[in-house]
């Protein structure tokens, strides 16, 4: 329970980037969770559920800025301050991400017991010591998993763990607050350079360092390939007009009484099918908000706020559980989980939160 709670808190703390968070949490907690006999599916679920669901609730993230920019100019939302006020009012009504984050904490603490495929995965890990199922294909190369520590060198926790983690968080947070976006790629790059120099200082031969770099690059190829394929499918879906078709098909069912719920379902389906939450926002928000304002005579009422939250929550649902989503792929990569196993074990939890949010 303690390891799972640490992973949960760590994911919430790294709120500023939905891409950085699952990769960071999975990588940092991977070996620790293995020793605690926590399945890879469980770790990837925790990492994934504290990524996009957290980012969309915090008003100082790229997600918030993007959602607010889509609202400016619609109805009585004239300025950025108006959009920010709308976003803040929508947080308590953004049920899906709230439920998703809370459910992780309840499960990690043992208050809510695992169910569905996740229960079987956890039972396998605890009773058989298998954090991966037999025949699973983890989204990182086996070379990285099976890599052994260099013999003859005493491990230095400060240089090999504490400093790199602090560097990544400091650079990512620093660039987020100073430049407006978290430079996660640069954070990892500079940390890798530091790690290479640190290994040399500790007496590890240059040849061994370069072999380690090669193994790391090789192990990342499966994840990069899957991401490229996911982006290709997303682009194809956009070209075919899948999202627009879904919206037009549901337009006849929209009435004030069910408007937020229908918008939420449409956004969920669209985001899951395309794997793109931001693409869903871009298509749904310009339709949902004008519809809501049409029923309120241009006034910012609870209906408008609820529709804004429905688009945000529905988009996060797709980003959270679609196998095409980059954050879902990165969660599998960071935890070293089989991607399909991660999706299958997480889906019942996501659907539970989705049904509760719909109700």
List the predicted regions and their residue ranges:
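Juxtamembrane and boundary regions of transmembrane helices in multi-pass small-molecule transporters
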Residues: 54-143, 309-359
